[in-house]
């Protein structure tokens, strides 16, 4: 059933309303629930509790969409002209194969991208327990309607957005939706804060989140696309996905080539007519010249180089889902990183411990019979599973793990002190207590908020001795609590008492009194050790790291300082922005503010999208990392979305362009290095192909002006499709240049032709064309045989381009500043292409097809010498460029 947009005012204000007021608005009796008649009416009004997303386009529609790329249009036009005007079907077939291959790759990538929205559907709870017609029923979750009374307990997936009516020690894990790193304590009190963020709505539970502890009764306030997950699905379906830098570069290159090709063809046509040549002849010459100017192999070579990059990245734990993402990573200027699980371990860990009057770090050795360890372990609901893994609330598992690290005999203590009674955690008193038999008496263990627990303590244990708790003790304990809280540690206190008996129905005010204070523990989700070093490397490469999290500002700021995102020892609050503060800003204000902000806290999915978009408005290439459902819209909005392979939801992975197999921020920096290498290698291939094609154009154009017939179409075709292709692919296997991570990221407005590449293409093309024309003239002067002159020009142009492949290993660096033969693939490609070129010239039958004459050994020496000279000329030009750049 299709969902209808009939959202009521009470649905938006449910978290602010008193329960009786809400139930009157909902018209739902809490004890009996809705009747079957009510349910039918509401299903007709509101529709189904399911995510409705736009229908995916068909494979054929996706395939046709790929042909809207400008470079592809140019290639198709070239194929058509080649086939119908000059009847060169070989060229047309090759071009069409290249275009179809690229289209297929694009379809595969788009199909993968749609997985994000599909994965959202898998989050839904299959069933829900509701009160209907005065009975408790189990129904399919898609049958829920607003006003349904739902029963929740530990282990349930919340089936819709709901306002709590009753809550018994309820904790809900909302990390995937809000980014909060620990389960949230829930209660039923109305929220007075206007426009409170979803992370601050303690009386609400949201579709797709997990109940980790306690029980509750709630009323459904939103279903399907009206839920918070539904809003995310809607943002995913309508996320703006801009073209990647590579796609923009190829578009610009295609347009530039079109203008150049049309201009050259027109000038050649007019010049030929002025020289008295026939219109039909000049039309064919112009078409041949235009087709020769197009680097037919560039899209295929780019695809191959990107594919090689994906393989290299996969070996380094970065799994690329879309090919252009490889190159986009290299251009990254800003990394908007989620905190939990990416910059931190997503594992609460005790870092500080206060006992025996001293605050110490976690490395301190604590005796296994210490009351602090015992209380932390016994007043605890976490368990070890069959594989020895701790299961339970992250705060509680952190306590048990700390005890295990201290070699505490966990199983022995559980057997020795079995739990016989308990006072569960309650959000009002913020304590939990358990009772355990101990000889003829009972041991009461209590843990909870330090300020609450300290009020109930009358004694303190130090060095095994119990004494009365003094006012000075209280001040010292609260002082240490404050110190840890300032470091964004979550602080819990532990205490104990010896009882004579256990009440059947224990009451806090009776049993949680006159306790013996045992100590404090401070815990945090710690930063990954390698993350700080990776952030420093990124900074050295000119890449800014920004933290975005659903956690509180104080916690986020502390972690950011420890990671080096913010400087230590300074007042950094001005560089931290909360979701509430962001909400007050217009898009224009945020666009101006983002360069100043390094940490965003308590943000919603909409905020994350706005942050990414604001950076993009500042002209930056943005990477966004995330693992939760709440990250998915921003992942899709970013120039490159980076998901987490271990902790990431299927939704976040589906919205990503790249997935980190190890969830490690360091891997992003490694991938940026690989991306820079890939861009550099594509740039080298572009420089190589365009300088080669420009050299051919110069040769043909000048020859036309001079009335020479220097190269035949079959010669150009052979060089473009054989001689050029193998070295261009091999250039994609070049190693990263030594300073690749010391350079600043390239600007978003830059292109393949920036930073000296265009100048290099022009002068190197002129060199290739000039040397080819020179040998044609030289052969004519000394050997007086037209066919031999054409052959020597053909051989020289081919060999020139093979030698030139080594020149483009670096735009400015000397070829001999290192090992010029360090790329074995380029060496092999050059030898293979040279062998094929030699083969068509000296092999009987084949040389007749190509209309060439085998030169003598001496003539080959001339060809080789002139071809090799391009290395000398380019080395001189590079030296001049380096001198000019230094002086500038």
Where are these regions (language model features)?
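A C-terminal functional module that forms or caps the active site or interfaces directly
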Residues: 808
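Alpha-helical transmembrane segments of multi-pass integral membrane proteins
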Residues: 760-775
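Conserved cytosolic headpiece of P-type ATPases
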Residues: 1-745, 752-753, 766, 777-781, ...
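Membrane-helix interface and helix-disruption motif detector
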Residues: 782-788
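Generic alpha-helical transmembrane segments
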Residues: 723, 768, 791-805
């Amino acid at each position: 059933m299709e969902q209808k947009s009939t959202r009521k005012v009470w649905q938006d204000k449910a978290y602010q309303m008193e329960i009786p007021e809400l139930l009157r608005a909902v018209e739902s009796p809490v004890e009996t629930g809705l009747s079957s008649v009510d349910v039918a009416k509401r299903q007709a009004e509101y529709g189904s509790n399911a995510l409705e997303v736009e229908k995916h386009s068909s494979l054929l529609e996706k395939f046709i969409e790929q042909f809207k790329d400008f470079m592809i249009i140019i290639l198709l036009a070239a194929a058509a002209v080649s086939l119908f005007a000059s009847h060169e079907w070989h060229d047309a077939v090759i071009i069409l194969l290249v275009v179809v291959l690229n289209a297929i790759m694009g379809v595969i990538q788009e199909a993968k991208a749609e997985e994000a929205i599909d994965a959202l559907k898998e989050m839904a709870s299959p069933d829900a327990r509701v009160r209907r017609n005065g009975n408790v029923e189990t129904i399919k979750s898609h049958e829920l309607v607003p006003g349904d009374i739902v029963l929740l307990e530990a282990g349930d997936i919340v089936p819709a957005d709901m306002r709590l009516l009753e809550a018994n020690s309820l904790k809900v894990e909302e990390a995937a939706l809000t980014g909060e790193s620990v389960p949230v304590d829930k209660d039923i009190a109305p929220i007075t804060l206007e426009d409170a963020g979803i992370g601050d709505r303690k009386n609400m539970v949201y579709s797709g989140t997990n109940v980790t502890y306690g029980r509750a009764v709630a009323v459904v306030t939103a279903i399907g696309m009206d839920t918070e997950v539904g809003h995310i699905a809607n943002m995913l379906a309508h996320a703006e996905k801009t073209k990647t830098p590579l796609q923009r570069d190829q578009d610009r290159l295609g347009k530039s080539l079109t203008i150049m090709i049309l201009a050259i063809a027109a000038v050649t046509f007019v010049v030929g007519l002025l020289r008295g040549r026939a219109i039909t002849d000049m039309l064919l010459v112009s078409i041949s010249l235009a087709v020769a100017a197009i680097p037919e192999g560039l899209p295929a070579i780019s695809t191959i180089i990107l594919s090689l990059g994906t393989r290299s990245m996969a070996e380094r734990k970065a799994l690329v889902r879309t090919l252009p993402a490889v190159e986009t990573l290299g251009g990254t200027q800003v990394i908007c990183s989620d905190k939990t699980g990416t910059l931190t371990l997503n594992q609460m860990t005790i870092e500080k411990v206060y006992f025996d009057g001293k605050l110490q770090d976690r490395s301190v050795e604590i005796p296994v019979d210490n009351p602090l360890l015992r209380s932390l372990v016994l007043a605890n609901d976490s368990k070890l599973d069959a594989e020895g893994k701790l299961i339970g609330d992250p705060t509680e598992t952190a306590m048990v793990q700390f005890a295990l690290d201290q070699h505490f005999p966990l199983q022995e203590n559980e057997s020795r002190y079995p739990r016989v009674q308990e006072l569960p955690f309650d959000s009002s008193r913020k304590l939990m207590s358990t009772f355990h038999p101990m000889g003829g008496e009972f041991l009461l263990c209590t843990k909870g908020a330090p300020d609450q627990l300290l009020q109930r303590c009358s004694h303190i244990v130090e060095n095994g001795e119990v004494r009365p708790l003094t006012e000075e003790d209280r001040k010292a304990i609260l002082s240490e609590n404050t110190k840890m809280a300032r470091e964004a540690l979550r602080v819990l206190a532990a205490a104990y008492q010896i009882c004579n008996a256990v009440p059947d129905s224990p009451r806090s005010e009776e049993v949680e009194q006159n306790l013996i204070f045992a100590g404090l523990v401070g815990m945090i989700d710690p930063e990954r050790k390698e993350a700080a070093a990776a952030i420093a490397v990124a900074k050295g490469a000119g890449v800014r790291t920004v933290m975005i999290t659903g956690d509180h500002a104080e916690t986020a700021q502390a972690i950011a300082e420890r990671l080096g995102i913010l400087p230590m020892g300074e007042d950094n609050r001005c560089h931290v922005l909360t979701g509430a503060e962001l909400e007050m800003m217009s898009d224009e204000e945020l666009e101006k503010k983002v360069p100043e902000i390094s940490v965003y806290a308590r943000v919603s999915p909409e905020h994350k999208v706005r942050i990414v978009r604001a950076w993009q408005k500042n002209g930056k290439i943005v990477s966004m990392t995330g693992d939760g459902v709440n990250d998915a819209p921003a992942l899709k909005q970013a120039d490159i979305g980076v998901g987490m392979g271990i902790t990431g939801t299927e939704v976040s992975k589906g919205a990503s362009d790249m997935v980190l197999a190890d969830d490690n921020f360091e891997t992003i920096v490694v991938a940026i290095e690989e991306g820079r290498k890939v861009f550099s290698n594509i740039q080298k291939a572009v420089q190589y192909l365009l300088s080669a094609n420009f050299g051919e154009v110069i040769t043909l154009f000048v020859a036309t002006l001079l009335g020479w017939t220097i190269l035949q179409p079959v010669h150009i075709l052979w060089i473009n499709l054989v001689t050029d292709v193998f070295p261009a692919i091999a250039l994609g296997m070049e190693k990263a240049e030594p300073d690749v991570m010391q350079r600043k990221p390239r600007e978003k407005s830059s292109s393949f032709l920036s930073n000296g590449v265009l100048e290099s293409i022009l002068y190197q093309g002129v060199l290739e064309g000039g040397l080819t024309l020179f040998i044609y003239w030289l052969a004519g002067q000394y050997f007086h045989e037209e066919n031999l002159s054409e052959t020597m020009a053909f051989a020289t142009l081919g060999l020139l381009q093979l030698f030139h492949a080594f020149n483009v290993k670096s735009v400015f660096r000397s070829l001999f500043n290192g090992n010029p033969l360090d790329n074995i693939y380029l060496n092999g490609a050059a030898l293979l292409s040279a062998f094929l070129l030699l083969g068509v010239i000296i092999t009987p039958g084949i040389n007749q097809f190509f209309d060439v004459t085998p030169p003598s050994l001496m003539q080959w020496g001339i060809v080789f010498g002139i071809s090799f000279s391009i290395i000398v000329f380019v080395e001189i030009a590079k030296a001049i460029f380096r001198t000019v750049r230094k002086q500038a």
